[in-house]
Each structure stands twice: as C-alpha cells, then as structure tokens.
Amino acid sequence: KESMGAYAALFHQLGYNVLLPDARAHGQSQGHYIGYGWPERYDVRKWAKRLIRDHGPKSQIVIFGVSMGGATTMMTSGLQLPAQVKALVADCGYSSLQAELDYQAGHLYHLPMLVRIPVEGALSVINRVANGFFTQSASSTRALHHNHRPLLLIHGAADDFVPTKMVWQNYRATQG
C-alpha cells in the first residue's frame, strides 16, 4: 500500500475519489496466502460493486495496479464487471503466474530447466492446496481475451523483475 501512496495522492489531487485496499494477505487485509492476483480478481470486482452501491450508479471506475496489482487488474478484466468499470491500467503486470515463476527461477535463482520443471510443478501443487488453484490457471493473457474495455499497459524496458516481453503478450491478448 505504501508504494501506491504516491499514485493515490496524485489521483486525489486531480479530483478523483480513490480506494486503496490491501490485497489478500497484505497489510491489514485478511487472508494467510497471497493469491498472485487470481483469487484477488474477485475481491476487485466486489470492491467495484461496493463503490457503486456507496456512490451511486453514475460512478465511473478505473481499475489500476502495479506489478502483481497490474496482473490482478488484467485478470479482473476477464470477469463479468459492472458497466461502471470504464477502463483498466496495468503497470508491469505479468502475463501469467507460471511464466513469471519460470522467469524468476531462471533469472534470479539461475535454476536450469531440468530443475525448474519439477520445482515449479511442486510449487503448483502446494499452491493448489494452500490457495485452491494451480499456478497454471492464473493467466492475465487468457483473461484479457475476454476484455473489451480500454486498457492502458505500462512497462519499463529496464524492468528485470517482470520481463518486458510480457507486456507485448498482454497487448496482443486484449480485446480492449
């Protein structure tokens, strides 16, 4: 939440109302396990519905997220969303959890493919037990095939945590 404070302040100064929630298992939010955007997409939809309930049907909502929040934003785009959700902004979001895990295993930990495959398989099973889904399910690009809203994708070329190639995969996937 602290890293999003500057964005929230800017949007507020520009006259927008801002909802800045903690994602699952972050900050003051409930939950014991981070879902990497996949279960959180339902939370985002609930927050949008709550905003409409609290501020009226003329509300206009833009969903914005950075990194895992960017992936969450794109994963949310694949759901049936209220008409008041007008646009989405995803900054440095990954194309899929599996692709991001594979990239990190190779880039950060320098694991050879022969080791990565069984490790990632085990992580997927552990995640299924803890979070209720296999890591292969959490895909921004698959969700974006169902998106028809305007989507602004932002990604820096020097990003070494989420590879820049993923923004192009997301761009090609969206219908918005």
Label every model-predicted segment.
Residues 65-75:
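Glycine-rich nucleophile elbow surrounding the catalytic serine of serine-hydrolase chemistry
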Residues 75-134:
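Hydrolase active-site cap/lid region
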Residues 146-147, 153-155, 159:
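Short beta-strand/loop motif that positions the catalytic acidic residue
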